[in-house]
Amino acid sequence: MTLKASEGESGGSMHTALSDLYLEHLLQKRSRPEAVSHPLNTVTEDMYTNGSPAPGSPAQVKGQEVRKVRLIQIEKVTEEPMGITLKLNEKQSCTVARILHGGMIHRQGSLHVGDEILEINGTNVTNHSVDQLQKAMKETKGMISLKVIPNQQSRLPALQMFMRAQFDYDPKKDNLIPCKEAGLKFATGDIIQIINKDDSNWWQGRVEGSSKESAGLIPSPELQEWRVASIAQSAPSEAPSCSPFGKKKKYKDKYLAKHSSIFDQLDVVSYEEVVRLPAFKRKTLVLIGASGVGRSHIKNALLSQNPEKFVYPAPYTTRPPRKSEEDGKEYHFISTEEMTRNISANEFLEFGSYQGNMFGTKFETVHQIHKQDKIAILDIEPQTLKIVRTAELSPFIVFIAPTDQGTQTEALQQLQKDSEAIRSQYAHYFDLSLVNNSVDETLKKLQEAFDQACSSPQWVPVSWVY
């Protein structure tokens, strides 16, 4: 299917509606009292490297620099990691590299990034490697005494940012991470609260809804995109077709853009910034899957069982109408010249050619369905997802996978292979994935999930709001 995004399309009224909904949600949150946190037991004592001058003494005493030193005692009563990593700065001094949000050190609040550590349990840290020092802190039980010079730089307020992961990540398999135990494992689609972005390569985050309160290290978008780009194959394989029009010859014309899968090959995904909105109605149901997976059966069942709720936008075509066909019902019949003009005017969200005839779905047809307060069903090529995934169309995207039961015929194996190719490239767009073992079961799960999405708070791309 040849694809073309409509450059003239904008967010429209739906964008305004979601923006207003988000603003109202923020105002309601502002009126709620903030939670109070209680630090762990810790003892601190201040002193100075040139004796004990009174507070407010000059920074220089007889040519010596006055440096405030703090003695910190931390009671470590469990096997819980301290949630801290160390590094050597440019002066080869041992400093705090990062503090994991929610960890032991973060909760008791006595250490900060950039603090210089002079002694651990009375032992001078000079001539000790970072690995040796971290091991000593990890293995110590009971009271840990640290002598530190506090970092005097101002500290930034906590971040309020949420990202949807667009790839799977396991820190145990990452050779770049500075500390595998400090890494955060997550899967595509997980919502990650970003706690700290000070390190350009390693951010700190926490999976939303997880029982684990402490944060972990995740690769920054820049690091992940560099990693993927550096190992990407020079010629990625073309994604299989899942178009309702079947396998089509590509229609090539001076008015048509190149197939957007070319641009997909250049896209390197990592994270997508999202915001949480109160419940709102999804306006479009999008079905994605390999050709032959059963999307047409599912679509037709939804249309026949819920005609007052779902509508399929009739495609436009240059094919001559058959005797039993009525213009505007199954298809809109137009001339090749008119369709070419419409394509040039960016009126189609998707178009292509099959057996010498052109087919396509117009934005306006979908808009008319929305104006009737009904839900448009689209079964489109996966390359079109980036075009329809907007606040204006507000889609709920469902990936239909082939059955994993029964005899593994050659045809089924090929279908599973095609399906996996689509999933691996476009999974970060999916709101729901279903295995189509039974059409009735798939329909039930799909409708339940769709209704749940429309009646519950939802994470949506920040571009839908701003």
Curated annotation (Swiss-Prot):
Membrane topology: Lipid-anchor
Location of the protein in the cell: Cell membrane; Cell projection, Stereocilium
Modified residues (Phosphothreonine): T49
Post-translational modification: Palmitoylated.
Principal cellular location given in the protein's record: membrane
Domain PDZ: 71-152
Domain of life of the native organism: Eukaryota
UniProt key word Electron transport: no
PROSITE patterns: GUANYLATE_KINASE_1, GUANYLATE_KINASE_2, PDZ, SH3
Any one of the GO BP annotations: regulation of neutrophil chemotaxis
Pfam families: Guanylate_kin (PF00625), PDZ (PF00595), SH3_1 (PF00018)
Claim: tRNA-binding is one of the keywords in the record: no
SUPFAM superfamilies to which the protein is assigned, alphabetical: P-loop containing nucleoside triphosphate hydrolases, PDZ domain-like, SH3-domain
Swiss-Prot/TrEMBL keywords: Acetylation, Cell membrane, Cell projection, Lipoprotein, Membrane, Palmitate, Phosphoprotein, SH3 domain, Transferase
Interaction with PALS1, as annotated region: 268-466
Positions of modified residues (N-acetylthreonine): T2
Residue ranges of every copy of the SH3 domain listed in the record: 158-228
Any one GO molecular-function label of the UniProt entry: transferase activity
Record PTM Phosphoserine, positions in chain: S13, S19, S52, S57, S110, S243
Subunit structure, as described in the record: Heterodimer with PALS1. Interacts with DLG5 and NF2. Interacts (via guanylate kinase-like domain) with WHRN (via third PDZ domain).
Similarity comment: family membership: Belongs to the MAGUK family.
Name of this protein: 55 kDa erythrocyte membrane protein
Source organism of this protein record: Papio anubis
